[in-house]
Amino acid sequence: MNSPNPIPNDTSIPLWITQSAHHQADVFARQQPSPQKAEQVYRNTLAVCVGNSYLKLLGIQTDVTASDSWNAVIRLASDVADLVVVGHGQLECRAVAPGAETCSVPLESQCDRLGYVVVRHEHQNTFLVVLV
């Protein structure tokens, strides 16, 4: 069961989605058994990539490859979009559609997280907006 959380509207930071992020999302999505799961994994992967870029801009060290979202078995079995913040734990990166007023967080991602980064897809996936 997902828990909806209100999304603040006061600040946002637009970040371009790199070709590398699109490529990684495509690779992970193609490994999925259904179109629905592929779309979920694609959006989650883009959210993690943009969350990673955002934290790097802030000078925060991350290890995306140590994240559950980079583990093929966990990615297949769960709705994960985590990013490891080195020395601190996992940050959840969630994507929402344009105009969304809530962000659903799956049960498996509601505990043991440092916090949440919510990104909104804009302009046919050319960039995501980090909602702060």
Named regions from a protein language model:
Residues 1-87, 93-132:
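Nucleic-acid endonuclease domains
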